[in-house]
Swiss-Prot record:
It catalyses: L-glutamyl-tRNA(Gln) + L-glutamine + ATP + H2O = L-glutaminyl-tRNA(Gln) + L-glutamate + ADP + phosphate + H(+); L-aspartyl-tRNA(Asn) + L-glutamine + ATP + H2O = L-asparaginyl-tRNA(Asn) + L-glutamate + ADP + phosphate + 2 H(+). Allows the formation of correctly charged Asn-tRNA(Asn) or Gln-tRNA(Gln) through the transamidation of misacylated Asp-tRNA(Asn) or Glu-tRNA(Gln) in organisms which lack either or both of asparaginyl-tRNA or glutaminyl-tRNA synthetases. The reaction takes place in the presence of glutamine and ATP through an activated phospho-Asp-tRNA(Asn) or phospho-Glu-tRNA(Gln). InterPro entries: Asp/Glu-ADT_sf_sub_c, GatC. It comes from the Bacteria. The gene is gatC. PANTHER family: GLUTAMYL-TRNA(GLN) AMIDOTRANSFERASE SUBUNIT C, MITOCHONDRIAL (PTHR15004:SF0). Its EC number is 6.3.5.-. GO terms for molecular function: asparaginyl-tRNA synthase (glutamine-hydrolyzing) activity; ATP binding; glutaminyl-tRNA synthase (glutamine-hydrolyzing) activity. Heterotrimer of A, B and C subunits. The lineage of its organism: Bacteria, Bacillati, Bacillota, Bacilli, Lactobacillales. HAMAP family: GatC. SUPFAM superfamilies: Glu-tRNAGln amidotransferase C subunit. This is Glutamyl-tRNA(Gln) amidotransferase subunit C. It comes from Lactococcus lactis subsp. lactis (strain IL1403) (Streptococcus lactis).
Length: 101
């Protein structure tokens, strides 16, 4: 089994601003190790002569024409906002320290 450490899982969690219990860290460490093992197994598969497949399903991306449309009336929007600051809508902080990830 590939070695991914609990410290690595904790580091990624910290960068992602996520908090996990010790049981969750152990579980993620085991799961990520299994995923890495599976990817390494796929790396060993001989794909020589196998035709390249762009899409395993016959689905296509259907894109609409990009058409500019009139947006909301700023004055009406700002009148409906409960809290504003310097002309912007003020919302609660998503990050506890307010800093970068």
């Amino acid at each position: 089994m590939s070695q991914i450490t609990e410290e690595q899982v904790k580091h990624v969690a910290l960068l992602s601003k996520l908090e996990f219990s010790e049981n969750e860290v152990k579980s993620f460490t085991d799961t990520f190790g299994k995923i890495i093992d599976m990817v390494e197994m796929l790396d060993e598969v001989d794909g020589e002569g196998v035709p390249f497949t762009m899409n395993v399903a016959d689905n296509l991306n259907f894109m609409r024409e990009d058409v500019a449309e009139k947006g909301l009336d700023r004055e009406k929007l700002m009148a409906a906002v409960p809290e504003k600051e310097d002309g912007f809508i003020k919302v609660p902080a998503m990050l506890s320290d307010g800093g970068d990830a």
